């Protein structure tokens, strides 16, 4: 291999290491949902929520727990690390093969209890989790969003 080729290869490898890790996750369905929720809040005069790694983790963990246990419902206690003084949870299940982020948000917005959490100005952090799989034998998308205030 010529010296020029080795230098080009080295430059490409170094450049690939410098790309922020968040870029891959920025296009994930969970990141898209958080952007849609923030747009929904901002359209109603509220500030956007900050994404929390801890709330992302707890949301994803609980979505997986529901999918694998066959239970769909709110949990009694949200298990998120960090010092949150207040936490909220919304969940949604979509049956079928098509992931519909907008449909999940519309379902929450049309539910008074869920909409109250979406538009609660006391929350400043958010996390989203999505698990897709089989729930009682049917293809299902399971959403969980956790909201927090420190």
Which residues does each predicted region cover?
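Second-shell loop/turn segments in exported
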Residues: 22-28, 42-51, 88-98, 102-105, ...
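Residue-level "edge-of-site" marker
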Residues: 54, 79, 131
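Disulfide-stabilized extracellular recognition modules
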Residues: 98-150
